[in-house]
Amino acid sequence: MLTSLDRKLIGWSAAFVVSQTLVAKVLGPTAPRVLEVQTAWSAPRYRKVLASMDDADIVRYRSHYYLDMIHPAIFGVALFIGGRRLGQITELSPVTRAALAAAPIVAASGDYVENFVGLHLLDHSEDITDTTVRTTSAIS
C-alpha cells in the first residue's frame, strides 16, 4: 500500500523527469556543451567551449538556464521526500537523518549558484577566470 510520502515521492520524481526532459529538449544538440562547461577547469577551456557554439547554440544554452531555475527546487523536494521516506522504512542515525535533510538543500543551492554564474559569464566574458571557473565547476 502506498503511503502519503510514497505518492508525493512519485509525483515529485515524475516532475523531476519532466523538468529534466524539458531542459534537454531546450538544449537539443547543445546538451553536451553543458557537461563541457561544468567540467572546464580553466578559463581558457571555458572560453573555448563557449566559442565552439554558434549563435543558435548560445540561444539554446542561455534558454536552458531559465528552466534550470525551477529544476533544482523540483529535485530538491524529491530528494527531501525520498530521505524522509527512507527514514520511515529503515532505522537511521540522527547524523544520517540530518545529512539526508541537508543534502537536497545543498544540492539545489549549488545548482542555483552554477546557474547564476553561468548566465553572468555568458554576457561578461571578462569575468571568466580560472578561480571563477574552478569554483563553479566544483560547486556543480
How does the language model describe each region?
Residues 1-140:
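Short amphipathic, positively biased membrane-proximal segments
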